[in-house]
């Protein structure tokens, strides 16, 4: 990637002098800057633009880092092969005529992919504009622009859109750290670029225009890794695109691409925006270290009508208007005219001077119910727009609550906006735009907060017996079925700790009567058929049966009705089920396989109207308690189940338990293509799955990897093992979990000064919640932390931690080990380092390294015994390194 994006030598394959040609434009862009050597390649020319032209890349006398290919598509595979033989590691294919041209073009892409794998080169494109990096004077594109250096990395899959935005940015004096057009993304994709610019010190924020994600697992891993430190802003079109596949389940029908992408972006800490016009505004404001802690906005305005417009925009976008406290109203009374609005929006009236504005803003800032302030100015009254702007800038510098401004009008307002722009304070010409920006800030902060939340520990069985269930699925497929019946689906749920209503599948009326008498009236009858997914649609459900006579009548009527409506369907029997006498709420909990992001989980309002109300949210497994709660909170039905019109509130903790258990089931079973629990019924404090259906993915039965259906690596239970210290004390070695934050905090707080300095190279008195969360909530693809857990009489505690963090090139990893003072010299440090070496081997790393205090003789001795080389460094440090391959 370094050769690709920071080359010293570049070959332009297809260079020409023809005016207006791509080959000439690319060459002119590259030679405009003298920082690197550029070699034209064209077998038909001896010279191009006064430079020697080479017939092939193999004739160039030096090693080339980057080749830019601008020749016809049919000749590209052979040229990529030639580049590979010449040792060229980076290639940009600008040429078009690949998959966008049909099957023949797709075949050319497949050839290039095989060649790329053979030589290990990295390729951007094909069908792209190229790459621009202003800070290093690299313009390997055919765009006739040279953007100024800046702090925004803009990556676009669409060349036309990328070109237009770049042109607009040039006019608006916006600079870039990088512009890249990715085209068809046969190799380098968004995940690769995020990794690269995430490590780039010139990049402060990352903007993406995405049509397709590429490697979703790589994208999620990269985005989660850098979203904490650099805002990632995404535009992904296709909000109303319907899935081309006919879904069997409600979940499959509802959870479309838009919702799945939305869930992925939230999980990664990425902010999604809807309009291109918002891209650069979002990039600027999201860098702010002061993001709103909540959605509640106070509006201070000198025009009541504009305040109403701002309020409408806020409510339409699901924001909240702050309810000012009685104390705030009282304080405002002392500063406002007698006939002021006495509420939010705070109308300071048209004759307001600067002091009245300032007093209103300060009162709102001191109100705990205010998370941010929108200040609106219209050109009237005594307040001069530029002087008022300067006072607001002073206030904004002293508060952690964001202040956004709207200066409406022409020349006078422009003077105030200039003050804000000079001082990096968000300012807009319309209240709608300002409100939208505030809510982007809130959503981004909320997404980041999710990364920092510590989940509560739930008593969910993390490893229930499952192999007999996999045998059940295999038998089902062998029978020629891909749809589990209700009873089989409930078997999966029950074994994972999810409460289900018991069903009796009966073959005749006598069996049905016996089952009803055993379970007790009232009962429900449901048709059982491998050909019928939605029973209600064919009249296949009868409720409220209270007697033997009623059951006899309804049993026969049920079968006749279904045969009339679905004469081709095979009827396997009739299910008899105890009926809930009162259902307070009906929910749906389901899963489906998305073509890009693997299996996703859906929660929402259930029942027969589930696809009409469409009140649901989507999340990516695996889920913990925090993520389960967030999944519920994003629906309207969550407010209802808090208690509604005399109905009792649901047991939210039990629902969290059920959702996490369901997530575990989905993680363990790649064989599940779609699954619905509908309804998941709540009656008082009781929760039960009344109906369930499961669609099997036959292809997944032969999958070599148990987690290919997931884009977020689940908890790596294979590293869990009991182990004894030298003194015989037994500990549990296992990967760290987000729930471990309290135990890690306790361990760090009880360490000696020497132990802390040995790990952190400085005296550390207090570690923030955010940092502890970062230590515990890790991406198991890119990092591993093994903890030693000691179980004492009434509690568990951590006594040691070994960690390896993998570099973004996935070739090496840095390790560190910390053992509690009370448990040193007992073999634990040696064991942790050895486990980290094994993990590095498994992940295919080439080397493991660490930085150790030279005075830490014990750790250096362990490293030498395990085969590390030790090299002294300045400042009393030593570098230890172990080459694995």
Feature-to-residue mapping (PLM):
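Long, contiguous binding/interaction regions
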Residues: 698-885
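Generic detector of short, aliphatic-rich beta-strand segments that form the cores of beta-sheets
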Residues: 689-694, 878-880
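Catalytic-core regions of core metabolic enzymes
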Residues: 1-691
